[in-house]
């Protein structure tokens, strides 16, 4: 496939692993041009955002310089956002109107927020997606006095803890966590849910195990009001971008690009996808940065194979259990691994070490360390 173009759409966790592979092992074949399309110069590591809110990190920490990483990998960086994909015509249209042609493409642009769709519209509503927009808005606003966090997954729980311990806020914000009907940390072991519930009580965070909604300008769960609230955070998971559903790629019932165990589109063999923009056709797989990180090297290997006119061979088989480290914002964290759990300052130290090691490896490769 020499003289051809590989287009990497999005700068998510999987694609930074592809860039790292290009740096370590060299570009994938003579004459192959790789282009990276991202709306932002930096990838913000979302796992460090709660720590930043709680004053444990600086705002500038947790960033991977995608442009610098691309330059070191021999990849052309184009700033822009994909708004349309034509897999048959092999082109992408960006938000500036530019059309980028490709021979092979990989999608790792993430999902989109669904706060307004699930809760309703309100000027106080702030979705965690896209994460960079979330960080910029939080950084620019005065400390809120009363916050409602909608979403009972690990992301929503961490944000509730972080906002209760918001750096520079005096008095500390009053925080309410509305988990949704699925409850607190669905899919996690009972021991972990119990430890998190205890920590919520200890920190004075109100817990509502019900769906939240905006009704006539008021935040509600059932017949109960969650008002007053200065800020409403939507941590409700990601929806598929419209352009994926409209592209003609095979998608699941919710519009995510269907891929096989090689992370190759089941309908268009020259398209690959990973992260929140994709869904596995062979098995259910929750959208999590953990899976995107581990899928990255698999994606890199398979892109190399396809660019060498070979069949993809590498497969991603998710581990039975994943390690989750939930920052409680007060100098501690709660670890979850299957049925096992632990809590304390040492768990937080482990989280910081893992997070900073991940960032540091890409900073070194990009030459920005």
What label would you give each PLM region?
Residues 2-7, 72-146, 168, 220-222, ...:
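FAD-binding core/adjacent interface of flavoenzyme oxidoreductases
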Residues 123-144, 226-294, 301:
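FAD-site-proximal beta/loop scaffold in flavoenzymes
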Residues 14, 110-113, 238-240, 331:
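Short glycine-rich anion-binding loops that position phosphate/pyrophosphate groups of nucleotides
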Residues 77-85, 100, 168-261:
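A Rossmann-like FAD-binding core segment of flavoenzymes
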Residues 2-75, 157-188:
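Beta1-alpha1 glycine-rich phosphate/pyrophosphate-binding loop at the start
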Residues 277-329:
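A conserved FAD-binding loop/helix module that cradles the flavin
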Residues 95, 108-109, 209, 235-236, ...:
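Short, well-ordered coil/turn residues at beta-beta hairpins
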Residues 330-369:
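C-terminal auxiliary extensions adjacent to catalytic cores
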